[in-house]
C-alpha cells in the first residue's frame, strides 16, 4: 500500500524505533522565541549541555514586542525580561537571533518561510501552537512545550508517536473575493474545533493548489484550530518558485537536486487516509466567526444561529455561553453590530499578499470615526516590501495605523489589546474568551473583510464593495 505525504516525511525522520517505545524523530529546524524558551535554556545550563545543532536553530522576538517603538521596555517588565533573557541565551549558546533591531525580525512563522529556513520534507518544531503554518511547504511542523524545546535543543530529536491521517479536499474553484482565510474557516465550521483531534491533516483539491504560498500558510496555520496535530500541503511548482533564491534555500545545482526530491513528496495514489472530509469550493462565502472558538463560524450573509438549532447538547450549551459572552442575539445579522477595533496581522494573515488585499479595500476610503484599525506587518521584510509598494501610504491616508512587526493584538501579551466588551474584526486565528484582552470580543475574518469592517464600522459583505478598476 502507498504512503501519504505525512507518512513519507515521518518515516524519513525516524532516528530510533524500538519495539514498544514511541519513535524518536530527527528534527531539521527548531524555531525559538522569547516566551517559551527561557526555562529550556536554563535546563541546558543546569545540566551542562550545549545546543546540539546551532546551525538548525533560529530565534526571533515576536510575542510581546511593541508595535509602536523598538524600545525593549515598552511592553512592560515581563516582556523586557523575556526579550533580554532570549538575547543572553542566544549569545551564550551560539544561536542565531533576529532581535528587535534586526532586518529579519518578525513573527517566527513569517520569518522562517520568507528566509528559506522552511523547506519541503523537513521536520520543524517551535514552542508555539501555530507551527503548523510551515506545513504549507510539505514539511511536518508542529508546536511543542517548553520541556520538549529543551529536549530538541539538547539532542536535535523528539519522541513523537505516529498520528492518524485525515484528507481535507476542497473541490473546484472558489468564487471571486473568497480567500484562504474563508476556505479554512469554512473547513473548521464543517469539522468543528475538535474534528481533527489526533490527526495530521493533508489539505488538497483544486481550491488549495490554486492558492499562493501565503494563502497555503494561512490554511495550514489554522490546522491546529480544528484540533489537528499538524497540517500539510504537497509541494509543487508554486512552492519551488517561492523558495528559489531565498537566503537559506539551496542554490544552483543543489536547488535542482532538492527539487527532484521534493517532487516525490506527495501522497501515493493507493495511499489510504483514516478520515476524509470534502468541501465544494463554490459553496464557500466570506466567513465570520460569531462565537468563542473558530468552529463557531457563519457566512457573512447568514443570521446568527440560535442555540436551539444545535442538536448536540454540548454544542447547544456552548452556543448559549458564546452568544452571552459575545453580546450577540440569535437571528440577527453580524452587520447589525458595530466593531470598535480592527486588526490585520498575526502569523495567519500578515504577509505581503494580506497587506495588499487590505490595501485594495482601504484605497480612497476612510476608517469609521469610532474604529481604531491596526495594520501590523508580520516581519521587517514584509514591512519593507509593503512600503516599497506604497501600501503604508494608502493605509495611513485611510486612517489605519501602520505598525512595526510583531504578534500584536493576536494575543494579550503586549500593549495591543481589547478593552472589556470591545468588539474586534481580526485576521488572527483564535477567538477564545479573553484571547485579545479580558472580556474582549473577537470575530475572525480575512484581511479584506477586516479592512471593509474598519471602513463601514461594522461587518459588511466584501462581495458588495466596488473597487477602483485600476487596481
Swiss-Prot record:
The keyword Membrane belongs to this UniProt entry's keyword annotation: no
Keyword entries, A-Z: 4Fe-4S, Amino-acid biosynthesis, Branched-chain amino acid biosynthesis, Iron, Iron-sulfur, Leucine biosynthesis, Lyase, Metal-binding
Keyword Iron: yes
Pathway in which this enzyme or protein is active: Amino-acid biosynthesis; L-leucine biosynthesis; L-leucine from 3-methyl-2-oxobutanoate: step 2/4
Cofactor-binding details, from the entry: Binds 1 [4Fe-4S] cluster per subunit.
Enzyme Commission number(s) of this protein: 4.2.1.33
Domain of life from the UniProt record: Bacteria
InterPro entries with a match to the protein in the record: 3-IsopropMal_deHydase_lsu, Acnase/IPM_dHydase_lsu_aba_1/3, Acoase/IPM_deHydtase_lsu_aba, Aconitase_4Fe-4S_BS, Aconitase_4Fe-4S_dom, IPM_dehydratase_rel_enz, IPMI_cat
GO process terms (BP): L-leucine biosynthetic process
Catalysed reaction equations from the record: (2R,3S)-3-isopropylmalate = (2S)-2-isopropylmalate
Cofactor: [4Fe-4S] cluster
List of residues binding [4Fe-4S] cluster: 347, 407, 410
GO molecular function, one term: 3-isopropylmalate dehydratase activity
SUPFAM superfamilies for this protein: Aconitase iron-sulfur domain
Family: Belongs to the aconitase/IPM isomerase family. LeuC type 1 subfamily.
Assembly and oligomerization: Heterodimer of LeuC and LeuD.
Function: Catalyzes the isomerization between 2-isopropylmalate and 3-isopropylmalate, via the formation of 2-isopropylmaleate.
Protein's recorded name: 3-isopropylmalate dehydratase large subunit
Lineage: Bacteria, Pseudomonadati, Pseudomonadota, Gammaproteobacteria, Vibrionales
Amino acid at each position: 500500500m502507498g504512503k501519504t505525504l505525512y507518512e513519507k516525511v515521518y518515516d524519513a525522520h525516524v532516528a530510533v524505533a524500538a519495539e514498544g517505545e514511541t519513535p524518536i524523530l530527527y528534527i531539521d529546524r527548531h524555531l525559538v522565541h522569547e516566551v517559551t524558551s527561557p526555562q529550556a535554556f536554563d535546563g541546558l545550563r543546569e545540566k551542562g549541555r550545549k545546543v546540539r545543532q546551532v546551525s538548525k536553530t533560529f530565534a526571533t522576538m515576536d510575542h510581546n514586542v511593541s508595535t509602536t517603538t523598538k524600545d525593549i521596555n515598552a511592553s512592560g517588565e515581563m516582556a523586557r525580561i523575556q526579550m533580554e533573557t532570549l538575547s543572553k541565551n542566544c549569545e551564550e549558546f551560539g544561536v542565531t537571533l533576529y532581535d528587535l533591531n534586526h532586518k529579519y525580525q518578525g513573527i517566527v512563522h513569517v520569518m522562517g518561510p520568507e528566509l528559506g529556513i522552511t523547506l519541503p520534507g523537513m521536520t520543524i518544531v517551535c514552542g508555539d501552537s501555530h507551527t503548523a503554518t510551515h506545513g504549507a511547504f510539505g514539511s511536518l511542523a508542529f508546536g511543542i512545550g517548553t520541556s520538549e524545546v529543551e529536549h530538541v535543543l539538547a539532542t536535535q530529536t523528539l519522541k513523537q508517536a505516529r498520528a492518524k491521517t485525515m484528507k481535507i479536499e476542497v473541490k473546484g474553484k472558489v468564487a471571486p473575493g473568497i480567500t484562504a482565510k474563508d476556505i479554512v474557516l469554512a473547513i473548521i465550521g464543517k469539522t468543528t474545533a475538535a474534528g481533527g483531534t489526533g490527526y495530521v491533516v493533508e489539505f488538497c483539491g483544486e481550491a488549495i493548489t490554486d492558492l499562493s504560498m501565503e494563502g497555503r500558510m494561512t490554511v495550514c496555520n489554522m490546522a491546529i484550530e480544528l484540533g489537528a496535530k499538524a497540517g500539510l500541503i504537497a509541494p509543487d511548482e508554486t512552492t519551488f518558485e517561492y523558495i528559489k533564491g531565498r537566503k537559506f534555500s539551496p542554490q544552483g545545482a543543489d536547488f535542482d537536486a532538492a527539487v527532484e526530491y521534493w517532487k516525490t513528496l506527495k501522497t501515493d495514489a493507493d495511499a489510504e487516509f483514516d478520515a476524509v472530509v470534502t468541501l465544494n469550493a463554490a459553496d464557500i462565502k466570506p466567513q465570520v466567526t460569531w462565537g468563542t472558538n473558530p468552529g463557531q463560524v457563519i457566512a457573512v450573509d447568514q443570521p446568527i444561529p440560535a442555540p436551539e438549532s444545535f442538536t448536540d447538547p454540548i454544542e447547544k450549551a456552548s452556543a448559549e455561553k458564546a452568544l452571552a459572552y459575545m453580546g450577540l442575539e440569535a437571528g440577527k445579522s453580524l452587520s447589525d453590530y458595530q466593531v470598535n477595533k480592527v486588526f490585520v496581522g498575526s502569523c495567519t494573515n500578515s504577509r505581503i499578499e494580506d497587506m495588499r488585499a487590505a490595501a485594495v479595500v482601504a484605497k480612497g476610503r476612510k476608517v469609521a470615526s469610532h474604529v481604531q484599525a491596526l495594520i501590523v506587518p508580520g516581519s521587517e521584510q514584509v514591512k519593507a516590501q509593503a512600503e516599497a509598494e506604497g501600501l503604508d501610504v494608502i493605509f495611513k491616508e485611510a486612517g489605519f495605523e501602520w505598525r512595526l512587526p510583531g504578534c500584536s493584538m493576536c494575543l494579550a501579551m503586549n500593549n495591543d489589546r481589547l478593552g472589556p466588551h470591545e468588539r474586534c474584526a481580526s485576521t488572527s486565528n483564535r477567538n477564545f474568551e479573553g484571547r485579545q484582552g479580558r472580556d474582549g470580543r473577537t470575530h475572525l475574518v480575512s484581511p479584506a473583510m477586516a479592512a471593509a469592517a474598519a471602513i463601514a464600522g461594522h461587518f459588511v459583505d466584501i462581495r458588495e464593495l466596488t473597487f477602483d478598476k485600476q487596481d
